[in-house]
């Protein structure tokens, strides 16, 4: 895949869009392109992982399974990224990811991402900002689910 094409993609990805052209070019050469068929599990919760992914085309579902029930956490599309938690924490994957359509992604290894963090202050600050927004959204979802559970329990007690 051409470097210019990957640079064009990265300029639209929230964690990479603050990089200058020189760093984008260096980073773009580290990505590996993959075509993934519909219904392919990219990774499962609790898998070990040292790569993050950027979607070029297609849709993927991020989900968790509990007692044979599946809960969709997010639907991701072009210019979205995933897999970063394991890259930064070296912990197992926190959710599973599966393609919902034929998809094209680019993959970046942990060591390459860590190098750009070490060498680019502006990138590091932007990364903190983007990940903080993800945390805020996750906290809002938790709060919403907690409130719904309280309402459901209260309704059940009244009936």
How should these model regions be labeled?
Residues 41-47:
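Short phosphate-coordinating micro-motif centered on Lys-Gly-acidic
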Residues 28-29, 47-49:
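Short, small/polar residue-rich loop motifs at catalytic or cofactor-binding pockets
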Residues 73-129, 136:
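Cyclic-nucleotide recognition modules
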Residues 66-68:
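Solvent-exposed strand-loop boundary residues in beta-sheet-rich modules
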Residues 118-159:
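Polybasic "coupling" helices that flank or enter modular domains
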Residues 39, 50-63, 78-79:
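Glycine- and acidic-residue-biased ligand/ion/polar-headgroup-sensing regions
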């Amino acid at each position: 895949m051409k470097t210019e094409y990957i640079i064009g993609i990265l300029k639209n990805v929230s964690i990479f869009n603050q990089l200058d052209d020189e760093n984008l070019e260096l980073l773009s050469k580290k990505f590996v392109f993959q075509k993934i068929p519909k219904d392919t599990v990219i990774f499962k919760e609790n898998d070990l992982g040292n790569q993050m992914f950027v979607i070029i085309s297609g849709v993927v579902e991020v989900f968790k399974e509990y007692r044979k029930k599946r809960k969709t956490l997010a639907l991701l599309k072009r210019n979205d990224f995933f897999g970063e938690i394991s890259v930064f924490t070296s912990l197992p994957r926190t959710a599973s990811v599966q393609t919902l359509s034929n998809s094209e992604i680019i993959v970046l290894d942990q060591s390459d991402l860590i190098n750009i963090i070490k060498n680019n202050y502006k990138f590091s600050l932007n990364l903190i900002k983007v990940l903080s927004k993800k945390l805020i959204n996750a906290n809002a979802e938790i709060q919403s689910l907690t409130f719904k559970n309280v309402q459901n329990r209260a309704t059940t007690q009244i009936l």
